[in-house]
């Protein structure tokens, strides 16, 4: 389920706050990786909270988006939401197959990211 550690740039400072890029470099374990979103944890313990990060749409190039090593080259990832495990009893918990991202510039639409990392329906 987990892949090797990568260094991510542009993480947000606090969960559940408005999107705000930071110039910090932190190390995380990547649980799942989509084209424009990744789920990360600091531990392999699935009882720990995870974060869903969304790639800043104004950053990177087409080459970076298609590259397997894009995490090393795309500088800005923004915090989207905290994924709280079911054993914590939170209604905010999201399953891996149910990550939802707001559609940029749209009203009411959502973008889903499946567990295998493919982007689905807009």
Swiss-Prot record:
Top-level taxon of the source organism: Eukaryota
Annotated family: Belongs to the FAM223 family.
UniProt-recorded name of the protein: Protein FAM223A
């Amino acid at each position: 389920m987990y892949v090797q550690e990568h260094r991510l740039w542009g993480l947000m400072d606090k969960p559940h706050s408005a999107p705000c890029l930071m110039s910090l470099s932190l190390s995380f374990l990547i649980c799942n990786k989509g084209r424009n979103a990744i789920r990360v944890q600091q531990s392999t313990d699935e009882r720990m909270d995870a974060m869903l990060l969304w790639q800043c749409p104004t950053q990177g190039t087409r080459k970076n988006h298609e590259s397997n090593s894009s995490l090393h080259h795309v500088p800005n990832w923004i915090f989207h939401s905290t994924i709280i495990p079911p054993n914590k009893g939170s209604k905010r918990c999201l399953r891996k197959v149910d990550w939802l991202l707001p559609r940029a510039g749209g009203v009411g639409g959502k973008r889903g990211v499946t567990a295998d990392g493919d982007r689905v329906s807009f």
